[in-house]
Design a protein with these regions (language model features):
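Peptidoglycan cell-wall recognition and remodeling modules
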Residues: 26-122
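Cell-wall glycan-active module
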Residues: 1-38
């Protein structure tokens, strides 16, 4: 669960209608991971395999990589379980915002994952 204002980490990740799936693509665990890996490698080329593994574990624990995961105890929603995310937010946007949040708050996934292991949230 994430508790900082959305605008702090969505400032540079604006809604882009091109993110919405226009064809038969179904966002599932595999397509979400594939997209996240591509975005992570493009935006953070120095992050290696360990950072990817940490991200897989972190979001696996938070949502099982389910773009429709809904936390009944908070406003957290989606793959990254970001607070105040509207239901129906496209999976690519969830992933981009989740990575932006991790960079903003923790610098990289391994630190976010360590925090999650200690506190049960990130």
């Amino acid at each position: 669960m994430i508790g900082i204002p959305i605008k702090a980490y969505t400032q540079h990740v604006k809604y882009d209608p091109k993110c919405i799936e226009t064809g038969p693509r179904i966002w599932n665990k595999i397509t979400a991971k594939t997209y996240a890996r591509a975005i992570m490698n493009a935006q953070h080329p120095t992050w290696g395999r360990n950072e990817w593994k940490a991200l897989v574990k972190l979001w696996g624990k938070e949502s099982a990589w389910d773009a429709t995961a809904d936390n009944p105890d908070s406003t957290a929603y989606g793959i990254a379980q970001i607070l105040n995310t509207k239901k129906g937010t496209p999976a690519p946007l969830q992933i981009e915002r989740g990575l932006a949040y991790i960079v903003h708050r923790y610098d990289k996934p391994s630190i976010a994952w360590a925090h999650h292991r200690k506190h049960g949230w990130y």
